C-alpha cells in the first residue's frame, strides 16, 4: 500500500501546478496566509477527488440521486483513501434538530428506554407491570407458609343478561362460589330471593363481588405450586386477563393483570417511537414536538427576573388599576408559604407554578379564575371585545414553552417511563458532563444489562468523545441551529470518532475555532486518537499548538492570492527546530521562498505588544446579565478602546455579547430591534454611541455574481467613469451598461456570467467558456469603451493592488479611496471581479471590515467582531490589528470575542468569563488590562497569557 498520498499538477483556484507528498496515517497540518490556497488543496483538490472517486464507483442508477462532482484540476492523485470533510459550518437550520439527535445519542436513549424502561403510574407512582401466571404464583409464595388465601376473578356486569341469568350460566359451567367483601357466598344462595339478588347485584356494581375459584394455603411444594398455577390460569381466563388474591385474616386484596394497566389506566407499551418528538406517536399533540407554542411569553411578562413579586416582577400587574391583581396574589400567597420578597430567578418550580397557574384557595371567588398570571390573561380573553384588552394580550404574546409537555416535546405517556428513576426528558436537560457521570453510576439488573449492554457502550463512548472535544457543557436538548460554527464542527468530529471508521482521510477546517487554549490540548488528543486507529488526518489550521503537535506541516504561500499557491515548506516541525536552531531566517530546503509560518514558529517574526494601553473614562454597563448560564453579572464595556471578551468554551461570551449586549444597544438605538437576552439594566454613556455593527464571518454574498468591489461600493464609481468616456456618451451608454447584472451591456448568451453550464446526465455539469463573449461577460460594443487603454473587463481582471496603482496614476481619487481599505486589510491580492463565493470565511470578514473602514462615518460607532482571527495566519492577524487601530483612531469603539492570545495581549481591556464552561461558568473572572490579568493570575486565560506576555517583555528588553 502507498505510504504517501501523491498530488501532482494541482491547479485548482490559485494553486500553481504544485506537487506534494502527504504521509498516510499521520496527523498533517496545512497552513499558510489567508487566501494562499490551503482550502484549495485540502477541500477543492483532496476531498473533491476522494468524493468523486467514491461516487464514480457507484452504479449509474445510484449516481443520478447524488450530487454530481466536478473533477478537480489536477494531473493525478495516487494513494488517496476515501475522504470525509468536517467543515466549520452550522450544519442544521432545522428547528427540530438537537445536539442529542445530531450526535445520535438521543436515538440510543430512545432504544434504551423502549427496552429496559419501567413504566410508573402517575396516580399511585407504582410500577406498571404486565403479569403472567408465574408472576402471580411468585407473589403468593412471598407470604408466610400456611397463610390462607383465595384465588378470585373479577366479575363484570353484562348488558345482555340479568344478574340471575349470569349466575345460572356460570353454574352450568361448573362454577359455584362468589366472594363478597371477603365472605364466601354460594351462587344459588345469591339468587334465591329478591332481597339477596338486590344486595349482591349492588355489590357487583360497586366492584365488591368476585368469582371465587379456589381456597388455598401458601405451600411451596411441587403439588401446592401446581394447584395454585392451575387456579391462577383459570382466574386469568375467566377474568379476561385479571386475577386477584385475597389474604386472610386481614382480607387484603392483591390485583394482577396480564394487560399493561394500573389504577384504572391502560398504559402504552414503550416503543422507540414513543420517545421520538419527530414521530406522531411520541410528539406532544399540542406543540407537535417543537416544545414551543404561541402564547404568553414569560420574558415579556417578567422582563427583570431579579425582582420579587412584591417589588413588581410581574410587568402586567403594575399600575394603579391592574395592581389589584398583585395585591390579591400577595394576600393569598401566605396560604401556600409563597416567598413574596424572593427574586423571581430564585423561586422553585412549585412556587413558579403557583404564580403562573394558581392552586387551591387562589380563586377570586368560587367558580371564578385564579389570582395568577394565567388567570389574569384568561380574564382578558373573556373581555376581548374591549380594544384595550386585545392590545394588552398582543403586548405579552410570543413564543413560550408548551404548557402541556413543559418543553419536553413529548406526549405525557413517554414521561411515565423511567430508567434509573429518570425520564428521557430529565436526561436530555443534563449537561454532557453530568450525563456521563449519571450513566457511570447507573445500576441495572443482570437481565437489563444483557439487553442494554451495546446501547450503554454506544451512549458512553459518544458522551466521552463530546467531553474530549471540549463540549461537556452542552445539554442534549440544545438546538443545533443555536450552536456556533466551531461547536457544530466539533460535534461532527465527535460523531466521526464515535463511528470508528478506519483507513479514511479526514479533512478538518480549523477545528480550534471557538476553543480556548485550555481546550486545544484535548482537541489535539482527539485528533491523534483518530490518527492512531488508522486514519490520515489533514487539518487546515493556524493554531500554534496544533502546528507544533502535528507529524507533518505543509506551508502554502508565500503570500496570498496570485502571489500564493506554492508549497513553501513541507516537513516535520520537530526536525526543523533541531536543524534550524542557528538559522536567522526560515526558508524551505525545497523552495527559496520565505515561510512566514516558520518565521513565526521559530520566533523570527512576531506580533508586538503595544507600547502603551489606551486609557478610557466612558463606558456602557450591562447590569444583572442572567441569560443561559450567566450568573446575574455586571459588566463594563469601555468606549473608544479595544476590548476583548475571552473565556473557556461555553463560559458565556457569545451569550453576553451576541445575545445581550448587541441587541440591548440595538434596542436603545432603535425600538424595533429583536428582544435581547435577560438582563436588568443598560447604563452608562449611551449617548456616546450612535450606531452599532456586528461583524461575523457569514459570506457577503452567495451568488457567483457578488464580488468584493461591489460590496465596498467601488464598482459604482468605476461604472460612472466608463459611462463618462466619449465613445460611451456618443452611444448613449448609461452606467448600468457596464454592469453584468443588468440587461443592456452584458452578454445575453451567458447573462453576464462569462460561462455557460452544459448539463450532463450522469456526470458533473460542464462549465464552458461562453462562445459569444469568450468569457468577457460584456457585448463587444461595451468592451470597445476604454479608459486609458483599459476596458471594463480589463479593469475587473486587475487585482486591488494593480487597480489602486492604475487609478492613482490618473488621479481618480474617489475610486482609490474606495479600494484602499481592501488593501489595508490585506486583500490587495484579490481581483476586482472575483466572485464572493470563492472567498474564505476570514476574507469575507475582512471585506466587511474594509467596507466599514471606507465609510468615513461621522457618527461614533460600536463595532462588535465575533472571532475575527478565524481563518487568519499570524501574518494576517498583525494586518487585522492595524485595521482595528484605524477604526479606533476615528473615534469608534471595538468589542471582540476572541481566544487568540496574540489578540488578547494587544487589547486595552480584557473581560474574562468563566471559570469553566456551562453551569460552572457565567461569572466575571476578571476585567482589566492584560498586564493586570496576568498579575492577578485568576482563570485559565491568565495562565496561558502569562508566558506570552513575559516572552514579549523580555524581547522588548
Residue spans of the language-model regions?
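Conserved phosphate-binding elements of NTP-dependent enzyme cores
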Residues: 1-957
Amino acid at each position: 500500500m502507498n505510504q504517501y498520498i501523491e498530488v501532482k499538477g494541482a491547479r485548482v483556484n490559485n494553486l500553481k501546478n504544485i506537487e506534494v507528498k502527504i504521509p498516510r496515517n499521520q496527523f498533517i497540518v496545512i497552513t499558510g496566509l489567508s487566501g494562499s490556497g490551503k482550502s484549495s488543496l485540502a477541500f477543492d483538490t483532496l476531498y473533491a477527488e476522494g468524493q468523486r472517486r467514491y461516487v464514480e464507483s457507484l452504479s449509474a442508477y445510484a449516481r443520478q440521486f447524488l450530487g454530481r462532482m466536478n473533477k478537480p484540476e489536477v494531473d493525478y492523485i495516487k494513494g488517496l483513501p476515501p475522504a470525509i470533510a468536517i467543515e466549520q459550518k452550522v450544519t442544521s437550520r432545522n428547528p427540530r434538530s438537537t445536539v442529542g439527535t445530531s450526535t445520535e445519542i438521543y436515538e440510543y436513549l430512545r432504544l434504551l428506554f423502549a427496552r429496559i424502561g419501567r413504566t410508573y403510574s402517575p396516580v399511585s407512582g407504582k410500577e406498571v407491570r404486565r403479569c403472567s401466571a408465574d408472576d402471580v404464583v411468585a407473589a403468593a409464595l412471598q407470604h408466610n407458609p400456611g397463610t390462607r388465601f383465595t384465588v378470585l376473578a373479577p366479575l363484570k356486569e353484562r348488558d345482555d343478561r340479568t344478574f340471575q341469568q349470569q349466575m345460572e350460566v356460570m353454574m352450568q359451567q361448573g362454577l359455584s362460589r362468589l366472594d363478597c367483601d371477603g365472605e364466601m357466598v354460594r351462587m344459588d344462595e345469591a339468587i334465591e330471593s329478591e332481597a339477596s339478588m338486590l344486595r349482591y347485584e349492588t355489590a357487583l356494581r360497586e366492584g365488591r363481588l368476585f368469582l371465587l375459584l379456589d381456597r388455598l394455603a401458601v405451600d411451596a411444594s411441587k403439588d401446592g405450586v401446581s394447584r395454585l398455577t392451575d387456579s391462577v390460569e383459570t382466574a386469568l381466563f375467566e377474568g379476561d386477563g385479571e386475577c386477584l388474591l385475597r389474604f386472610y385474616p386481614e382480607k387484603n386484596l392483591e390485583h394482577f393483570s396480564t394487560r399493561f394497566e394500573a389504577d384504572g389506566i391502560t398504559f402504552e407499551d414503550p416503543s422507540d417511537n414513543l420517545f421520538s418528538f419527530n414521530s406522531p406517536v411520541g410528539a406532544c399533540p399540542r406543540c407537535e414536538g417543537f416544545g414551543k407554542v404561541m402564547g404568553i411569553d414569560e420574558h415579556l411578562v417578567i422582563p427583570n427576573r431579579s425582582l420579587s413579586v412584591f417589588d413588581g416582577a410581574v410587568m402586567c400587574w403594575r399600575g394603579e388599576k391592574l395592581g389589584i391583581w398583585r395585591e390579591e396574589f400577595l394576600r393569598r400567597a401566605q396560604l401556600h408559604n409563597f416567598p413574596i420578597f424572593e427574586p423571581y430567578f430564585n423561586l422553585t418550580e412549585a412556587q413558579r407554578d403557583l404564580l403562573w397557574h394558581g392552586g387551591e384557595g387562589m380563586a377570586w371567588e368560587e367558580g371564578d379564575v385564579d389570582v395568577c398570571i394565567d388567570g389574569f390573561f384568561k380574564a382578558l380573553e373573556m373581555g376581548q371585545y374591549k380594544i384595550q384588552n386585545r392590545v394588552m394580550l398582543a403586548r405579552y404574546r410570543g413564543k413560550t414553552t408548551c404548557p402541556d409537555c413543559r418543553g419536553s416535546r413529548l406526549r405525557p405517556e413517554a414521561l411515565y417511563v423511567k430508567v434509573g428513576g429518570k425520564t428521557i426528558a430529565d436526561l436530555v436537560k443534563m449537561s454532557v458532563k453530568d450525563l456521563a457521570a449519571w450513566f457511570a453510576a447507573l445500576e441495572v439488573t443482570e437481565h437489563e444489562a444483557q439487553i442494554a449492554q451495546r446501547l450503554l457502550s454506544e451512549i458512553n463512548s459518544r458522551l466521552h468523545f463530546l467531553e474530549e472535544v471540549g463540549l461537556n457543557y452542552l445539554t442534549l436538548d440544545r438546538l443545533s441551529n443555536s450552536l456556533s460554527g466551531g461547536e457544530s464542527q466539533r460535534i461532527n468530529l465527535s460523531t466521526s470518532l464515535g463511528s470508528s471508521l478506519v483507513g479514511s482521510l479526514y479533512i478538518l477546517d480549523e477545528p480550534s475555532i471557538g476553543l480556548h487554549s485550555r481546550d486545544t490540548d484535548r482537541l489535539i488528543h482527539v485528533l491523534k486518537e483518530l490518527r492512531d486507529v488508522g486514519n490520515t488526518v489533514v487539518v487546515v489550521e493556524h493554531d500554534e499548538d496544533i502546528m507544533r503537535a502535528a507529524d507533518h506541516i505543509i506551508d502554502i504561500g508565500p503570500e496570498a492570492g496570485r502571489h500564493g499557491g506554492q508549497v513553501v515548506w513541507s516537513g516535520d516541525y520537530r526536525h526543523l527546530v533541531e536543524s534550524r536552531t542557528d538559522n536567522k531566517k526560515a526558508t524551505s530546503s525545497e523552495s527559496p521562498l520565505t515561510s512566514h509560518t516558520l518565521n513565526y514558529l521559530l520566533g523570527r517574526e512576531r506580533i508586538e505588544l503595544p507600547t502603551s494601553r489606551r486609557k478610557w473614562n466612558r463606558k456602557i454597563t450591562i447590569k444583572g446579565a442572567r441569560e443561559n448560564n450567566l450568573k446575574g453579572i455586571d459588566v463594563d464595556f469601555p468606549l473608544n478602546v479595544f476590548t476583548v471578551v475571552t473565556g473557556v468554551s461555553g463560559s458565556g461570551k457569545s451569550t453576553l455579547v451576541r445575545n445581550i449586549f448587541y441587541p440591548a444597544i440595538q434596542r436603545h438605538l432603535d425600538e424595533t430591534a429583536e428582544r435581547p437576552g435577560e438582563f436588568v439594566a443598560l447604563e452608562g454613556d449611551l449617548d456616546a454611541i450612535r450606531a452599532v455593527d456586528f461583524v461575523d464571518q457569514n459570506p457577503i454574498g452567495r451568488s457567483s455574481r457578488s464580488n468584493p468591489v461591489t460590496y465596498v461600493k467601488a464598482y459604482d464609481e468605476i461604472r460612472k467613469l466608463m459611462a463618462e468616456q466619449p465613445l460611451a456618451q456618443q452611444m448613449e451608454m448609461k452606467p448600468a451598461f457596464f454592469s453584468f447584472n443588468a440587461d443592456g451591456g452584458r452578454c445575453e448568451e451567458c447573462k453576464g456570467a462569462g460561462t455557460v453550464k452544459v448539463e450532463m446526465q450522469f456526470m458533473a455539469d460542464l462549465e464552458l467558456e461562453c462562445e459569444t463573449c469568450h468569457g468577457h461577460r460584456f457585448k463587444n460594443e461595451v468592451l470597445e469603451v476604454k479608459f486609458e487603454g483599459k476596458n471594463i473587463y480589463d479593469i475587473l481582471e486587475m487585482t486591488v493592488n494593480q487597480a489602486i496603482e492604475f487609478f492613482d496614476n490618473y488621479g481618480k481619487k474617489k475610486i482609490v479611496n474606495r479600494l484602499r481599505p481592501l488593501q489595508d486589510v490585506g486583500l490587495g491580492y484579490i481581483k476586482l471581479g472575483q466572485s464572493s463565493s470563492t472567498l474564505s470565511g476570514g476574507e469575507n470578514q475582512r471585506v466587511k471590515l474594509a467596507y466599514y473602514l471606507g465609510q468615513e462615518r461621522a457618527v461614533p460607532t460600536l463595532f462588535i467582531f465575533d472571532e475575527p482571527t478565524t481563518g487568519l495566519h499570524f501574518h494576517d492577524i498583525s494586518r487585522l490589528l492595524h485595521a482595528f487601530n484605524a477604526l479606533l483612531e476615528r473615534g469608534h469603539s471595538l468589542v471582540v470575542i476572541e481566544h487568540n492570545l496574540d489578540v488578547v495581549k494587544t487589547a486595552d481591556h480584557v473581560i474574562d468569563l468563566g471559570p469553566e464552561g456551562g453551569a460552572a461558568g457565567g461569572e466575571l473572572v476578571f476585567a482589566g488590562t492584560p498586564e493586570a490579568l496576568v498579575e492577578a493570575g485568576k482563570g485559565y486565560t491568565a495562565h496561558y497569557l502569562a508566558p506570552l506576555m513575559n516572552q514579549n517583555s523580555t524581547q522588548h528588553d
